[in-house]
Swiss-Prot record:
Domain of life: Eukaryota
Entry keyword Iron-sulfur: no
Matching Pfam families: Ribosomal_L21p
Record GO cellular component, one term: mitochondrial large ribosomal subunit
Protein's job: This protein binds to 23S rRNA.
Protein name in UniProt: Large ribosomal subunit protein bL21c
Length: 110
């Protein structure tokens, strides 16, 4: 089993070929190929490589599947004994990407 842990927008994601992840919105078209080069950890066969902070020469290739809005986050504010209540909602834009492969500059791992 080959997998990698990548960093994108300050968040870490467990990725392996054939899986999809939901990340913050990326300004690209559906069907475009993108590369993540901030790889924190790579496991291939029985070899584990940890970056300090990132692993050089490793890229994760992904394809953009769709853009969508995430679930609504509700923020509720209330002042006790005053009778004031406020509810606000927010839906962030997200992008779903399909992990196609984990690539090395010399050869393709998977």
């Amino acid at each position: 089993m080959t997998y990698a842990i990548i960093e994108n927008s300050g968040r870490q994601f467990f990725t392996e070929p054939g899986k999809f992840i939901d990340i913050n919105h990326i300004k690209a078209e559906v069907g475009d190929i993108i590369y993540f080069n901030r790889v924190l950890l790579l496991k291939s066969n029985n070899l584990i490589e940890i970056g300090y902070p990132f692993i050089n020469n490793i890229k994760v290739k992904a394809k953009i599947l769709k853009h969508f809005k995430d679930k609504k986050i509700r923020v509720y504010k209330m002042n006790p004994k005053k009778g004031t209540r406020k509810t606000k909602g927010y839906r962030s834009l997200c992008t779903r990407v399909l992990i196609e492969s984990i690539e090395n500059t010399e050869n393709i791992i998977n």
